[in-house]
């Protein structure tokens, strides 16, 4: 089951960046066989997520610029069907990449929000701890391994 230590702490915000207090880290749920989150561990996860947000926003902007270029080059009358098919494939590929980046951005921002509101590490399906090791490997995780495996079997 879950073990919650400490009490929920306030988060000071300076220039858009949250400062993690030790009590906030200790208040996050962990599995019984895990040590509580330390301030350093939570800061590391938060910084990774914030850098992912910046990277994903840049990648989305780049993909949207590529899509706009592909749409502008569009359908010119002198192209054969192979060229048109290639451009259509490239455009759809860029649109798919942009959509994937947007989904990852939403997941990343959601993980940051869960850290802020103290629900980071709680499985959204069963309410049990996700597991600190899983979150350190995949910080955007919202499901414990059991629930994730169940979801993938469906």
Where are these regions (language model features)?
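Short flexible coil/turn linkers enriched for glycine and charged/polar residues
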Residues: 117-119, 129, 138
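Cysteine-rich micro-motifs
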Residues: 141-148
């Amino acid at each position: 089951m879950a073990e919650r230590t400490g009490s929920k702490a306030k988060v000071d915000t300076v220039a858009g960046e949250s400062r993690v207090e030790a009590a906030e880290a200790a208040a996050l749920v962990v599995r019984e066989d895990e040590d509580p989150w330390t301030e350093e561990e939570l800061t590391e996860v938060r910084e990774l997520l914030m850098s992912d947000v910046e990277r994903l926003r840049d990648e989305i902007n780049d993909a949207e610029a590529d899509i706009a270029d592909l749409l502008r080059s569009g359908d010119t009358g002198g192209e054969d069907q192979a060229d048109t098919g290639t451009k259509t494939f490239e455009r759809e590929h860029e649109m798919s990449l942009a959509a994937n980046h947007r989904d990852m951005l939403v997941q990343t921002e959601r993980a940051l929000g869960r850290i802020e509101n103290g629900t980071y590490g709680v499985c959204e399906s069963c309410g049990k701890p996700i597991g600190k090791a899983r979150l350190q490997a995949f910080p955007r995780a919202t499901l414990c391994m059991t629930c994730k495996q169940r979801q993938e079997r469906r």
